[in-house]
Amino acid sequence: VYAPRTKGKHALIICPNGHFGQGRYRKDQQQRMATLARMGAVCVDYDLYGWGESALQVGGKAHHTADAHTIQAMNGIWILDYMLANRKDIDPACIGVNGGSGGGTQTVLLTVLDDRFTAAAPVVSLASHFDGGCPCESGKPIQLAGGGTCNAELAALFAPRPMLVVSDGGDWTATVPRLEYPYLQRIYCFYGATDKVSNVQLPQERHDFGPN
C-alpha cells in the first residue's frame, strides 16, 4: 500500500500487476506507485495469482490455470472491500483501477464485475482481436459467452465513466487508435461522454509498463 502523507480523503487506485519480471518489487513499478501516492492517491499494488510474490505461496504452476482467472479477479474485489472497510482516508466516490499487460486485462475485468470503480486505465492490453496470452486472462472463456464478445466490448461497458487506454506500436495494442478507440468513442457518444474516454498511443514503444 502506497499512501500520501497529506491528511483527509484520497482517491484509491487498485493496481493489478502484469506479467513483468520481479512482479511488484520491480523498481519502476515501485516508482510509479510512489509517484501516484505523491499525486494524492492511495495505491494498492499486488501480483497476479501464482505470479511474483504470490508464486511463493501457491507455486508458479497455479498461475497457468483457468482457476487463476477467477481467483485473481476475486483478489482485486477483496482488496477493494478491505480498503474501504479498514481505511478512513479513502474517498469511496473516487476509486480507480490501473494495470498493464495481464494487469490491464484484469483492469477491464474488474470494471465489469464491480460498479464501485469510477475510473479505469488499462495499459498495453486492450484489443478486440486478442484476449490475452495466458490462462489467467482467458482460461475462463468469458469472451465466448452469449454468442461471443471481446475485451474492447467489455471495456465499453464502463461508459460513461472515465477511461484512459494506453497502447503502443510494438504489440497487439498497435490497432487501438484505428480500431478499438473509435469503437469506444462511439459507445461513449451514446452517453454524451466522448470527452470521458481517451487514448495515448506510443508508436515507438514496446510491450512494457516502464518509467516512460
What name fits each language-model region?
Residues Y2, Y46, N98-G100, T105, ...:
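Generic beta-strand/beta-sheet core signal
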